[in-house]
Regions:
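Mid-chain, well-packed structural core segment of small domains
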Residues: 68-101
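Structural motif
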Residues: 36, 55-57, 100, 117
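Short acidic/glycine-enriched loop/turn segments that link adjacent beta-strands
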Residues: 34-38, 113
Length: 130
């Protein structure tokens, strides 16, 4: 049985996935598990005329409002470190020559019968990424 918070998170991930697909992203992985950590979405995009992939590790934050800050502001340094560890694990199994990587945050705000998306590409950088 899922809690209300878990159901909200799953709904937000579904909304974020659809939003990304409509903007030309392909989803490579959903809820990639690395022990107790996970990556919500792993998405890729290939720009016209190029063969290299841009791979984004997407953290989805779903909220009812921004009263306590934007969704991106809720991804603190501890969460960033966890995401980096999971990303390294994903890369070790899925690396392709020419891939570039980044961390994005998709904020999904649901409330009042509407949905608002806040997309933050390159939301944060990590020095020792590979």
């Amino acid at each position: 049985v899922l809690t209300d918070r878990q159901e909200l998170g799953i709904k937000g991930e579904w909304i974020a996935e659809r939003w990304l697909k409509l903007r030309g992203w392909a989803i490579l992985d959903r809820r990639f598990r690395d022990g107790h950590r996970d990556l919500d979405l792993v998405a890729c995009k290939i720009e016209a005329g190029k063969s290299d992939r841009l791979v984004a590790f997407v953290e989805v934050r779903t909220r009812f409002s921004t009263d306590f800050g934007t969704p991106a502001e809720t991804v603190g340094w501890k969460k960033q470190r966890e995401l980096a560890r999971s990303a390294r694990k994903w890369i070790s199994s899925n690396r392709r020559s020419g891939d570039t990587y980044r961390f994005d945050v998709v904020g999904v705000i649901v409330g009042g019968g509407s949905v608002q998306i806040q997309y933050v590409p390159d939301a944060f950088w990590l020095r020792q990424f590979g």
